[in-house]
Amino acid sequence: MRGGRPHNEDTHQAGTIEIPAFAKRQPVSLTRANKQLQENGAASESGDPQVFYFGVFDGHGGAQCSEFLRDRLHTYLEESASKFHMESSLQDPKESDDGHKQLLDLQRTLVNSWKDTVGGYFRRFRPEYFSIFKPTSSTDEQPTAVNSIHATLMYAFLHADMDFTAAQASKHTPSLPSSTDDPVLSDRPLNDNDVLSSPARPASQNFSNVLKRPIGGHTRFQGGSTASIALISTPTPTPFWNPASPATIVTAHCGDTRILLCRVSDGKAVPLTTNHHPSTPVEATRLRRFAATFVTDSFGEERILGLANTRSFGDISSKRIGVSAEPEIRLTHMDPSEYSFLVLISDGVTASLEDQEIVDIVKEAKTPESASKELATFATEVAGIRSDNATAIVVRLGGWERRVEGGGGSIGTKEVREWKKVQAEDPRASRQ
């Protein structure tokens, strides 16, 4: 929904993706017991159960970057999984020293591309490659599979951002007549084309088979986009929305778009992402070593070079100080009917509503589709003329039919939401 803005710079995507399964393997006894359910499900070309993909992208400065992510990010994931020879968590792992070396070489090459092309923050980037073999925790039962999807997501995000950033750096700024007057072009390394996906031609002419146009348009795009994606994998072909099916969710996130779960037992919102803002302790620690440009705007919000987000795709002028697309990755195992739904929202929704208010609005809707519309509409109405683009995706999970059971349903935030609507409709309140 466009809201009070002249253009809608938000985009979204949903569908299936061709990568191996990463779900937690079921015990043999349960697998046999659920054999009848499995026969009714769907499998991917590899024989694994299908992996589902959902994403929300909030563009700023234009929609070029968010449209690129909508159309291409899932293909970067598929290509990365293929390059990494990602193994299914449902099959026995294959050990190969040559394969391990190949993965490390791919990762090291990508990091070096960032160091050579952008420099700054990335010259201090550690490690040179991503950890894909070390367990993420002491209780990790399947370290290879877990770390494989982790490394695949990290590589895909940084590779997509490298292609987008390099493509913009090779173009002219419309207001500048030639490359000699362009600080980005004149400061470009001689081997810049070596890191492009089509090095034989300029990045501005690096057409994709999907977009059928140069990445980011014909002139340099200096804006960017946040990204929050969720991948859902099941151990059997039984779909994740079946009440009897367990599932695993992996989220990868940059910026201030958000992903929430609603727990059936108590009706509480469970955030799977954190906002990447300068005021966030982790982000402040990460960036203060490289940037002394934190400022506070008139609303008391900290910004870095005018940006509210410390992680994003694009934003080429801020890459050197660490505004990167390194994703925050989280893995969540779901028992059957443990959660009722998943929500992906842009900051046009979260600017007006708290996490619990968001899930309570969804509880009152009859279908996930109507819930998405009601979320965007409510957020836009409450924000009034100051409303931002608002986008919401609601995904039905196994506990959908029980979404109002725990925590008293949606009554906990009902008064607050009604008060916000009254305030929004009061003309005197809008003038304050």
Locations of regions flagged by a protein language model:
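PP2C/PPM-type serine/threonine phosphatase catalytic core
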Residues: M1-Y53, G59-Q432
